[in-house]
Amino acid sequence: MKILICGAKDSGKTTIAKPLAKQLGAEYIRCGKLYTIKDFVAEGKTVIIDKRCENNRKIEKLDPDYVIWMDTTEQRIDTPPKVHQHIKKRFDSVDQQVSAIVKKYRRSCS
């Protein structure tokens, strides 16, 4: 399973990605090295990919199963073609935000 957390610079991708990977028992990969991602997925692991994606070609190349779009800055990027969770504002509590993401993610997988 490949979970992509994408957004503009300083949108909070890493702030969410690291604790999310820990809560899901997933591997955290910053910037999406394709060979590493393929290896982890082949082993049956869930991978959290933390990547700045200014355009949809980058997203399509990663071929994620689940997309979290961090749309929290004034910088505009292409809207991802398929978004499972759209985060529109900064969060007061990272733990609460990650818990909400995990809950919605698990609901979508069942």
Tell what function each PLM region has.
Residues 23, 61-62, 108:
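Alpha-helix C-cap/termination motif
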Residues 74-110:
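Conserved GTP-binding G-domain of TRAFAC-class P-loop NTPases and closely related GTPase folds
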Residues 8-46:
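Conserved substrate/cofactor phosphate-moiety recognition/catalytic segment
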Residues 28-30, 69, 88-89:
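Structural signal for conserved beta-strand scaffold positions within catalytic alpha/beta enzyme cores
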Residues 2:
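Walker A (P-loop) ATP-phosphate-binding motif of ABC ATPase nucleotide-binding domains
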Residues 42, 46-83:
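ATP-dependent NMP and nucleoside kinases share a basic, alpha-helical "lid"
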Residues 5:
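Hydrophobic anchor at the beta1->P-loop junction of P-loop NTPases
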Residues 12, 57, 96:
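Residues that form or flank phosphate/diphosphate-binding pockets in enzymes
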